[in-house]
């Protein structure tokens, strides 16, 4: 079974950032080879439209057959608002709440990000999962790309 990995904008952008490039590039290469399924959202696609050309080329290198796109639908919006209402994230970070909610509602295997303040943050992960369980959703795994690479 191939892992379905929701990938936020920071990971694709990380391919062009010296600090994050090694693990971001390796993960994207796994998507290109079809070893993992790249799960994006319509929100991620919108955010990437404003990214540098080099970042957009990284995404374009992944065959469409290896990509799944999830929608920011009413279910995800409602779940994101529940994270905000519970104080897990402030309202000004609604886009981050949307990423978590889309991945949760889409029941991905893991969400990867380099956003340590609002996403890959133990206290917030506990908050997201507390809301998820109260709302009848499964807990969400949130990791960095380094933690999900095949040979790490």
What do the PLM-derived regions correspond to, one by one?
Residues 41, 113-114, 145:
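Generic beta-sheet signal
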Residues 68-127, 149:
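Active-site neighborhoods of divalent-metal-dependent phosphate/nucleic-acid chemistry enzymes
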Residues 58-61, 71-72, 144:
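Extended, non-globular alpha-helical segments
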Residues 1-40, 46-61, 67, 85-91, ...:
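Short, well-structured N-terminal submotif of metal-dependent ribonuclease cores
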Residues 39, 70, 141-143:
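General small-molecule cofactor/ligand-binding pocket signal
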Residues 34, 112, 138:
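Residue-level signal for beta-strand positions within conserved beta-sheet cores that form or flank
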Residues 122-141, 145:
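C-terminal end-helix/capping segment
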């Amino acid at each position: 079974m191939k892992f379905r990995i929701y990938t936020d904008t920071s990971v694709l952008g990380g391919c062009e950032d010296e600090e994050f490039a090694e693990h971001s590039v390796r993960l994207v290469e796994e998507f290109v080879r079809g070893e993992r399924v790249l799960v994006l959202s319509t929100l991620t696609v919108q955010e990437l439209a404003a990214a540098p050309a080099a970042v957009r080329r990284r995404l374009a290198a992944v065959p469409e057959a290896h990509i799944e796109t999830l929608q920011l639908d009413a279910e995800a919006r409602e779940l994101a608002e529940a994270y905000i209402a519970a104080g897990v994230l402030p309202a000004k970070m609604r886009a981050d709440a949307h990423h978590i909610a889309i991945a949760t509602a889409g029941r991905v295997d893991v969400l990867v990000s380099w956003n340590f303040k609002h996403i890959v943050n133990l206290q917030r992960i506990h908050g997201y999962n507390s809301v998820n369980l109260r709302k009848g959703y499964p807990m969400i795994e949130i990791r960095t790309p380094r933690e999900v690479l095949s040979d790490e």
